[in-house]
A protein has these predicted regions:
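Positively charged n-region of N-terminal signal peptides that target proteins for export
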Residues: 1-4
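Bacterial N-terminal signal peptides
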Residues: 7-14
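Sec/Tat signal peptide C-region and signal peptidase I cleavage site
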Residues: 15-20
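A structured, mid-to-C-terminal "fold-capping" secondary-structure block
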Residues: 21, 25-30, 143-260
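Disorder-to-helix initiation segments
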Residues: 27-43
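Alpha-helical scaffold segments that form or flank carboxylate-/histidine-based iron centers
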Residues: 41-42, 71-78, 101-111
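Membrane interface segments of multi-pass transport proteins and intramembrane proteases
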Residues: 56-74, 126, 137
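Mid-length scaffold segments of soluble, non-membrane domains
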Residues: 82, 89-161
Length: 260
């Protein structure tokens, strides 16, 4: 039972990255294709269970993490963000954006070495721009593959059929960090290193968005529908690479909701 809970928790932290863009900004486009909520009754039940788990586990842990000094949390965020380049770069290539692939490769090399494993974003300081994160779900979308039905996965949260498939590509060989730490079986890295990075990604994300999610829940007539709309619009924006923004959530990831 303990092992099952551990796997579910890690799964949640793996999927939280699908919300966060570069610097964690969540941007919503004005136009997005409608996505069917084929399993809405079941999705709502799963959503309610997830919210219960968040209140008793994830949110308290996130509050504890926020006790750490801001520079420490910033360094952790930078290091975790640096690792996401290992998924972003191959997706830049798959999407035909070789310029961004080259820049992100340079960012990763500089920050991993001079920036001490990514703790310091030296690359941005010397002029390497920071682009939005890319993932396999986005790449499938650029290939014209539709999102399929909207899903709320246990513990993991909002997704679609396409995004779920894209996320599983990571653990099927599409994530070099997963391959190096879990599959390589070397003396320097192990599955514990990967698990730790995923857990910290989730904790960092949740800690940045405590007030945002509280405000969203407080001001929503239907919290489930609000989260669904937020997720689907954000994913569509990232796939289309639009800069037409209706709302931006920030605090590195989702600090506050600003309605135009």
């Amino acid at each position: 039972m303990k092992k099952i809970l551990t796997i579910l928790t890690l799964s949640f932290f793996i999927f939280t990255n699908s919300f966060a863009g570069s610097d964690g900004e969540l941007n919503l486009s004005k136009k997005s294709k409608p996505v069917k909520d084929c399993f809405e009754p079941l999705n709502r039940i799963t959503f309610a269970i997830n919210m219960g788990l968040d209140k008793v586990i994830f949110k308290p842990v996130a509050k504890g993490y926020r006790v750490l000094p801001s520079p420490v949390r910033a360094g952790v965020s930078n290091a975790l963000d640096n690792l996401t380049n290992l998924v972003t770069i191959p997706n830049n290539v798959l999407q035909g954006d070789l310029k961004k692939a080259g820049i992100n490769t340079g960012r990763f090399a500089i920050n991993t070495t001079i920036g001490v494993l990514g703790i310091f974003d030296v690359a941005e300081f010397i002029g390497f721009p920071k682009y939005e994160k890319e993932d396999y779900g986005q790449t499938l979308g650029t290939y014209g593959i539709g999102p399929g039905c909207y899903l709320v996965l246990p513990v993991i949260g909002p997704s679609t059929v396409r995004d779920t498939a894209g996320s599983f590509i990571n653990v099927m060989g599409g994530d070099p960090w997963y391959n190096a730490s879990v599959n390589a079986n070397n003396e320097y890295l192990s599955d514990k290193a990967y698990a730790a990075s995923r857990v910290m990604t989730g904790v960092d994300f949740r800690a940045k968005n405590i007030e945002t999610l509280d405000n969203l829940e407080k001001n929503s007539m239907d919290f489930y529908a609000s989260v669904r709309s937020l997720y689907l619009q954000d994913r569509q924006m990232k796939i289309s690479n639009t800069e037409d923004i209706v709302e931006t959530m920030d605090d590195s990831d989702w600090e506050e909701i600003e309605a135009n």
